[in-house]
């Protein structure tokens, strides 16, 4: 570090260096976004000044007309973007332009693969902001002065690992960014090109974006008068808040461009919902469903929420109070007439209007997803990205549990595919005559679920079973108890009750078999002792010799593993061993002498636990027993 009269050279944070290099190489084909990102930042700076000036309008001084200006110099090869917003202090410059103050940055960078197309999508999803300037320039100079400070600051870097920072005199508040364009990016030092980019990407920005317009006087014969040039400033964007305009006047392209502004995303949203509500609760909302998940989706404490405006005045980004956690992927704005202009995050937690708004916006979001679900392909894209987050809903939002249940999708024996594309409504429509319950099975993965012995009787009878193989699924089902008046039943827990679908002859045969095998059951109970809760004959198996089930209210194996991994102490749970009386191994067990019987009984128990996704406490002994039997 070198220091001289408030001038110093500092190094970029490691993550910034990595991001700069990756971005410069990965985003080359999409490099015109640099202007959108810089204008978006400038608009945010104007919004922040407008908010601070609510309590102190002297901050405007004699310059209350907020604006963004873009100039270019073709000869020098520069593009300048300036605003008269809030500006930055020296500390803010170092913080904002030298570091990435976002949790999960290191993890995000690890996801990058070196494939340009794939990385471009990921980087766009992260939000590159100011650093996008380095896609088109090899040198950037920033001059800024925070509105409440007398001293200005200059920041300068070539994007190679360090930056210079120095105090300067800057009479006007706000920020000016000068991009020194690379040789292959000189095309951007052109008025028409810049206007086109503003109108394409930033037309919806509420702050006027102005560019200089040169006009020349002409004589009576129409010839230009030399030296008569005058420069005026021309507003080149629409400069009105998109959400306050009537829906019928807004094109799909404008909606998509606005989404990219609020979400800092490169890709289009899947759908959106624009509503203006008048009456007891007055608000306008514009909500979006993104087309892909952000890298920090599963950080429940991460940054999320809507942009909050009150009477069109920007109040804050990431206002998380207006949507429940399971809808944290929804992006957009809410503009309320019922909240105070001096509202803060703390006050939002106490304002009864916020709860009403949250309830209304939650309903809007769920209705938007219900509408999206009519387009199966688009909804599948949504589900693949956000399904696991939506599954948090039934536990968090009892009032909307039925609406959320309609939106859930599962794998199923109906398709025997790992793709989660089957709805509960679809399942109910396919239920067999006499079927009273919705059957499901929880496992660690799709293959473990689809090959589970518990499915054998269901496949034989043609009864559909939902296959749940996400980590959250067992927890989900502990809060989702019924759908459309039908109770859910875990096929791996409790007694299997298919009596409603069995004829009298079948029931009678099962009862007789159970009586005939009673001595065998007693022998197995004695052999296994306290390793099992119970041993019984089952008719749920057709191909496997045995399976283990848990009591109806016991915690499943999947949930136990999650709790144990989190360090939670859990009471011991003993399984129930069920034997298939028709299987040759069970017949062999029945005829075995005591020297073989105990080993074979334990092997059947251990195999059933493994098939269920459980873990053996002593796998070495299991292998010894198996080898001993195989060598006979």
UniProtKB/Swiss-Prot annotation:
GO terms for cellular component: cytoplasm. It is found in: Cytoplasm. Residues 562-632 are annotated as: C. Its main location: cytoplasm. Belongs to the heat shock protein 90 family. Homodimer. This is Chaperone protein HtpG.
């Amino acid at each position: 570090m070198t220091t001289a009269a408030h001038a110093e050279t500092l190094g970029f944070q490691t993550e910034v260096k990595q991001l700069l290099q990756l971005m410069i190489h990965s985003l080359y084909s999409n490099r015109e976004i640099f202007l959108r990102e810089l204008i978006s930042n400038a608009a945010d700076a104007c919004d922040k000044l407008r908010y601070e000036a609510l309590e102190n309008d002297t901050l405007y001084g004699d310059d209350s007309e907020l604006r963004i200006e873009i100039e270019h110099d073709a000869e020098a090869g520069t593009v300048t973007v300036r605003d008269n917003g809030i500006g930055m202090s020296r500390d803010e410059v170092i913080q904002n332009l030298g570091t990435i103050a976002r949790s999960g940055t290191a993890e995000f960078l690890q996801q990058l693969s070196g494939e340009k197309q794939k990385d471009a999508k990921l980087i766009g999803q992260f939000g590159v902001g100011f650093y996008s300037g380095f896609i088109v320039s090899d040198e950037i100079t920033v001059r800024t002065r925070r509105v409440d400070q007398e001293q200005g600051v200059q920041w300068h870097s070539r994007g190679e690992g360090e930056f210079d920072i120095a105090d300067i005199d800057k009479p006007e508040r706000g920020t000016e960014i000068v991009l020194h364009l690379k040789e292959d990016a000189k095309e951007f030092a052109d008025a028409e090109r810049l206007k086109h980019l503003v109108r394409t990407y930033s037309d919806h920005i509420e702050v006027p974006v102005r560019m200089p317009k040169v006009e020349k006087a002409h004589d009576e014969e129409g010839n230009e008068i030399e030296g008569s040039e005058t420069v005026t400033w021309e507003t080149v964007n629409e400069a009105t808040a998109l959400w306050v305009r009537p829906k019928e006047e807004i094109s799909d392209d404008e909606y998509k461009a606005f989404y990219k502004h609020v979400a800092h995303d490169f890709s289009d949203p899947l759908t959106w919902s624009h509503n203006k509500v008048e009456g007891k609760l007055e608000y306008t909302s514009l909500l979006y469903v993104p087309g892909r998940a952000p890298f920090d989706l599963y950080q429940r404490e991460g940054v999320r929420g809507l942009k909050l405006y009150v009477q069109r005045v920007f109040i804050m980004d990431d206002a998380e109070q207006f949507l429940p956690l399971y809808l944290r992927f929804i992006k957009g704005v809410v503009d309320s007439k019922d909240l105070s202009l001096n509202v803060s995050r703390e006050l939002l937690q106490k304002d009864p209007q916020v709860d009403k708004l949250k309830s209304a916006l939650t309903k809007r979001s769920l209705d938007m997803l219900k509408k999206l679900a009519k387009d199966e392909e688009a909804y599948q894209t949504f589900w693949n990205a956000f399904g696991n987050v939506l599954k948090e809903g039934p536990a968090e939002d009892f009032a909307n549990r039925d609406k959320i249940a309609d939106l859930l999708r599962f794998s199923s024996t109906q398709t025997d595919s790992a793709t989660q594309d089957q709805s509960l409504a679809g399942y109910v429509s396919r239920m067999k005559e006499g079927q009273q319950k919705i059957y499901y099975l929880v496992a660690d993965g799709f293959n473990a679920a689809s090959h589970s012995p518990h499915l054998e009787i269901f496949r034989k009878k043609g009864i559909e079973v939902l296959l749940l193989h996400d980590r959250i699924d067992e927890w989900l089902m502990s809060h989702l108890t019924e759908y459309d008046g039908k109770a859910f039943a875990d096929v791996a827990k409790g007694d299997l009750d298919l009596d409603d679908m069995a004829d009298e002859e079948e029931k009678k045969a099962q009862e007789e078999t159970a009586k005939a095998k009673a001595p065998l059951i007693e022998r197995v109970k004695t052999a296994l002792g306290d390793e099992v809760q119970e041993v019984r004959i089952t008719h749920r198996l057709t191909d496997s010799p045995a399976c283990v089930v848990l009591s109806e209210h016991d915690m499943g194996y999947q949930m136990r593993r999650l709790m144990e991994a989190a360090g939670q102490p859990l009471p011991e749970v003993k399984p129930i061993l069920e034997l298939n009386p028709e299987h040759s191994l069970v017949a062999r067990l029945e005829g075995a002498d005591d020297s073989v019987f105990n080993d074979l009984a334990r092997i059947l128990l251990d195999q059933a636990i493994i098939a269920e996704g459980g873990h053996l406490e002593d796998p070495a002994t299991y292998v010894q027993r198996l080898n001993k039997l195989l060598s006979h």
